[in-house]
């Protein structure tokens, strides 16, 4: 069973390995610094998908308001580690974000 939660700055250490998988050329300190800065932006949200207590997916997004559609969330990244890909977890994470929004 998987669970969904909004991630906070307390989760940065758990998020870093997934971002490293997406961007292996970055170093941990840069990722941590960038992530801390993003968490400080009021319209930023970060979402996690957990299998038991293990973070198996992360996505982030920006809450915006558009003249043509009103309030929305613009998803920035969806990261599912290679070991969990092709099992529907990415789709499930997007669906859970849609339900949250």
Set out the residue ranges of the language-model regions:
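A short beta-loop-alpha structural element at the N-terminal edge
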Residues: 1-15
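Glycine-rich phosphate/pyrophosphate-binding loop shared by adenosine-nucleotide-utilizing enzymes
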Residues: 2, 53-58, 73
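Alpha-helical elements of Rossmann-like donor-binding domains used by nucleotide-donor carbohydrate transfer enzymes
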Residues: 14-18, 33, 54, 92, ...
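Conserved GNAT-fold acetyl-CoA-binding loop/helix
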Residues: 16-37
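A short helix-loop-beta-strand connector motif used in the catalytic cores of GNAT acetyltransferases and
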Residues: 36-48, 57, 74
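Conserved beta-strand in the GNAT
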Residues: 48, 54-64, 79
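A conserved beta-turn-beta hairpin within the catalytic core of GNAT-like acetyltransferases
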Residues: 64-75, 85
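Conserved acetyl-CoA-binding loop-helix of GNAT-fold acetyltransferases
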Residues: 80, 86-99
